[in-house]
A protein has these predicted regions:
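Basic nucleic-acid-binding interfaces
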Residues: 2-3, 11-99
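Active-site flanking residues adjacent to catalytic metal/cofactor-binding acidic residues
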Residues: 6
Length: 99
């Protein structure tokens, strides 16, 4: 499974986003990545659908995101593609530790 993770510089985003409500940028990103087979896992972490997303589609999704949103490139401070071998939910361990 592939994932895209990123950080946005909030000051830069506030200056470059096309309206005053720059937090809407996260919704724009979500919509763009969903169109390429990704779903939001948490925060700025998106997992690709195993049956649709490979390394090339990660690159194409990010290129499309940057091309269609002129505020994205100047605002993104870090963005990475990750290959995830296992996706294990650790919440049972957390709950067991405090019970």
């Amino acid at each position: 499974m592939y994932a895209i993770v990123f950080d946005l510089d909030q000051d830069s985003l506030a200056q470059t986003y096309h309206n005053d409500s720059y937090k809407n940028a996260y919704g724009d990103i979500k919509k763009a990545l969903e169109a390429h087979g990704f779903s939001r896992q948490q925060g700025s972490v998106y997992f690709g659908d195993v049956s649709k997303v490979d390394a090339v589609s990660c690159v194409l999704a990010v290129m499309d995101l940057a091309k269609s949103n002129p505020w994205f490139a100047p605002s993104v401070s870090d963005i990475r593609m990750l290959r995830i071998e296992d996706n294990n939910d650790l919440m049972p361990a957390v709950k067991k530790a405090v019970s």
